[in-house]
Structures are given as structure tokens and as C-alpha cells.
Curated annotation (Swiss-Prot):
Keyword ATP-binding tagged: yes
Top-rank EC class of the record's enzyme: ligase
Protein name: Phosphoribosylaminoimidazole-succinocarboxamide synthase
Gene Ontology BP annotations: 'de novo' IMP biosynthetic process
Gene for this chain: purC
Organism field: Xylella fastidiosa (strain M12)
Top-level taxon of the source organism: Bacteria
Pathway of action: Purine metabolism; IMP biosynthesis via de novo pathway; 5-amino-1-(5-phospho-D-ribosyl)imidazole-4-carboxamide from 5-amino-1-(5-phospho-D-ribosyl)imidazole-4-carboxylate: step 1/2
Gene Ontology molecular function, alphabetical: ATP binding; phosphoribosylaminoimidazolesuccinocarboxamide synthase activity
EC number: 6.3.2.6
Entry keyword set: ATP-binding, Ligase, Nucleotide-binding, Purine biosynthesis
One cellular component term from this protein's GO annotations in UniProt: cytoplasm
Length: 308
């Protein structure tokens, strides 16, 4: 049975970062298994918070964090032959403080390596949609990459492209950047490794998703390095929050297809007299239920996991 969690409450675990959806805690070494105490580890909790237009909304989507965690874990396991990831395999319950309801966390949290984020969002696009479509209409390019003339909205690109962005703080907007800017920010060697890993994973995931009847239009990864400079994929992976998934049977060039994400929420918010700054408006129950159903369907179709 799915639980609902809006804010993590874990006495004894120092809160390192509170993001739009995830709460990140340092794990004191005394709480770790003896054979892992030589490293540094984090507990990452996927809450049921929902953000839209970079604003965290007041209403949670029940079970969303569990669904996101399970989808991420599925993809981390499925792509580990392509790229190492931040997971450790340490049992979540073993690091949680005593005296809390651990069932709130065991299906929505993971113990991870503590890595140094590379400082950019790594985005792969296989289709022309969203901010990429807007850039193309204005300049004929996406993140500095020249594309053929005459492409339509939602059209498949000749080849997937790497279109990084800055990583903004909560409440601020990410900005698309070109590869040269990425090189200036993180260095040429690391930029090339991140680009190559992003496209490698995208190719693999898009092929698998298509076999499930789903198009992976675009997706966003985060990467980090360890003290030896080894690159890992981290945070979340190929979830409906970080990816644009479309049902193949509803895909049509020239229009924005329905997606397995919070589009119901965005569409509803666009009907309101709201300036897209905090605090966000409350959501009707129907919008919450329909959004949750989309996340649940994505988990079932991609990972074969039924949670209801």
C-alpha cells in the first residue's frame, strides 16, 4: 500500500539539502554497516511533493515518491552495464533512526555514495518539443546545434542531441546552454564524458521504452564524480519527472502528445490567474488522481510493477 509523505522527519540524520521533490540527509558513520564506514554516504528520500513551473505546490501526489524511486531503481539496474550509478545496496531500514514509522521511507529512499555534482543538467533530446521547440522556432538551433529546416513540433530528430542546461536553485529557472559553455563551466574532458554517457544511456532507454509502447522524447540526467574522478549517474533516472514519455499510439507530428507526467497539473495551472511564483495554488482532487494514475501507468508499462 502506498504511503504519503510531504516532508521527511528523520531525527539524528542531518538534513543536507531539501530540493523540489527530494530530501537529502547525511548518514552518520555509526549508523552504517561496519564494512562501509570508510566512505561517505547519503540517504535520498523521494517525497510526494509536486513542482510545476519551478514552484513546489502545496498538495502532494500520494505515492508519487515511491513510484519515482522504483522507476529510478529499475533504470539504474538496467543501465549499470552502460554507466555506474550512485546506489550502494545498503538496506535503507538499517540507517533510519529508531522510533519512526520506517514503512514511510523504505520504498521511497535509497542509500547512495556521496559524489561531487558536475554542475550542469545533462539533457538528451530525441524529439523536438518543449523549450527545444521554442529555441528551434526562434533560431533554427537547439543549444547551439543547427537542425534541418522545416521540422515540426514533436518531430523525431535525425539523431538524438545533447542539450545541457544550468542547474538552478529551487524557485529559479534552469537555462539552456551550448556545449562550448559547458566546456567552460566543467572542462572539456568532463564535458565530453558527460555528453557521451548521456547519449549512450538515452539510445538504450529509448529502444527499451519503444518496446513497451512508449516514446522517450527527452530526458535529464545528473552526474557526479568520486574522489578518484570516476563518473556516476546520480539523483533520479528516467522518471516521469525527469523525462518526457509519450504513448506511441497517441503520437502525432505537429502537436504536443499526451505524456506520462504532471501535464494534467500544468494544463490546469495555465487556466488560473497565477503568476507562477510561490506560493502555488491548491489542486482539485480530480487533477491529483489523474496525475497519480499517469505515474502509476508509467511504472507498470516500463518496469512491469503494479502497485494498486
Amino acid at each position: 500500500m502506498l504511503t504519503t509523505l510531504l516532508q521527511s522527519d528523520l531525527p539524528g540524520l542531518p538534513l543536507r539539502h531539501c530540493g523540489k521533490v527530494r530530501d537529502v540527509f547525511d548518514i552518520p558513520r555509526k549508523r552504517l554497516p561496519v564494512d562501509t564506514r570508510s566512505g561517505e554516504y547519503l540517504l535520498i528520500v523521494a517525497t510526494d511533493r509536486l513542482s510545476a513551473f519551478d514552484v513546489v505546490l502545496p498538495d502532494p501526489i500520494p505515492g508519487k515518491g515511491e513510484i519515482l524511486c522504483q522507476i529510478s531503481n529499475f533504470w539504474f539496474q538496467k543501465t549499470e552495464h552502460l554507466m555506474p550509478n550512485h546506489l550502494t545496496g545498503i538496506n535503507v531500514a538499517s540507517v533510519l533512526p529508531d522510533g519512526i514509522d520506517k514503512t514511510l521511507y523504505t520504498q521511497r529512499a535509497v542509500v547512495t555514495k556521496k559524489l561531487k555534482p558536475v554542475g550542469i543538467e545533462a539533457i538528451a533530446r530525441g524529439y523536438l518539443i518543449g523549450s527545444g521547440w521554442k529555441d528551434y522556432q526562434r533560431t533554427g538551433k537547439v543549444s547551439g546545434i543547427q537542425l534541418p529546416d522545416g521540422l515540426q513540433e514533436a518531430e523525431k530528430l535525425p539523431d538524438p542531441i545533447f542539450t545541457p542546461s544550468t542547474k538552478a536553485a529551487v524557485g529559479h529557472h534552469d537555462e539552456n546552454i551550448d556545449f562550448d559553455t559547458t566546456v567552460k563551466m566543467i572542462g572539456a574532458e568532463l564535458a565530453e564524458r558527460v555528453r557521451d554517457a548521456t547519449l549512450r544511456i538515452y539510445h538504450f532507454a529509448a529502444k527499451y521504452a519503444a518496446e513497451c509502447g512508449i516514446l522517450l522524447a527527452d530526458t535529464k540526467f545528473e552526474f557526479g564524480t568520486d574522489i578518484d574522478g570516476r563518473l556516476y549517474v546520480m539523483d533520479e533516472m528516467l522518471t516521469p519527472d525527469s523525462s518526457r514519455y509519450w504513448p506511441i499510439d497517441e503520437y502525432q507530428v505537429g502537436t504536443s502528445p499526451p505524456s506520462y507526467d504532471k501535464q494534467f497539473v500544468r494544463n490546469y495551472l495555465e487556466t488560473l490567474d497565477w503568476d507562477k511564483t510561490a506560493p502555488g495554488p491548491t489542486l482539485p482532487q480530480d487533477i491529483i488522481d489523474r496525475t497519480r494514475a499517469k505515474y502509476t501507468e508509467a511504472l507498470q508499462r516500463l518496469a512491469g510493477i503494479n502497485i494498486d
